[in-house]
Amino acid sequence: MMSDATIVNCPTCGKEVIWGEKSPFRPFCSKRCQLIDLGEWAAEEKRIPSSGDRSDTDGWSEEENQP
């Protein structure tokens, strides 16, 4: 009997990955691909789009929020 395993593509290299406990780095195919993705986020090569720019004058500054 065949299981209906969900298969996704690795976001880094595109290799097929079975979504399950046998794939500990899911959705990535390997630790290497996982670290490449993390590095891209850390280097700000990837980002979540926003509708506007935030600056320290928008009330997000840590200095303004301290007692």
Curated annotation (Swiss-Prot):
Q: Which GO terms describe its biological process?
A: regulation of DNA-templated transcription
Q: What cofactors are annotated for this protein? A: Zn(2+)
Q: Which stretches are tagged as biased composition: Basic and acidic residues?
A: 44-57
What does this protein's record comment on cofactor binding? Binds 1 zinc ion.
**Keyword annotations for this protein?**
Metal-binding, Zinc
Gene Ontology MF term list: DNA topoisomerase type II (double strand cut, ATP-hydrolyzing) inhibitor activity; zinc ion binding
Q: Which residues are involved in binding Zn(2+)?
A: 10, 13, 29, 33
Family per UniProt? Answer: Belongs to the DNA gyrase inhibitor YacG family.
UniProt-listed HAMAP family = DNA_gyrase_inhibitor_YacG (MF_00649)
Q: How does it assemble?
A: Interacts with GyrB.
Q: What does this protein do?
A: Inhibits all the catalytic activities of DNA gyrase by preventing its interaction with DNA. Acts by binding directly to the C-terminal domain of GyrB, which probably disrupts DNA binding by the gyrase.
Q: What is this protein called?
A: DNA gyrase inhibitor YacG
Q: Which organism is it from?
A: Cronobacter sakazakii (strain ATCC BAA-894)
Gene that produces this protein: yacG
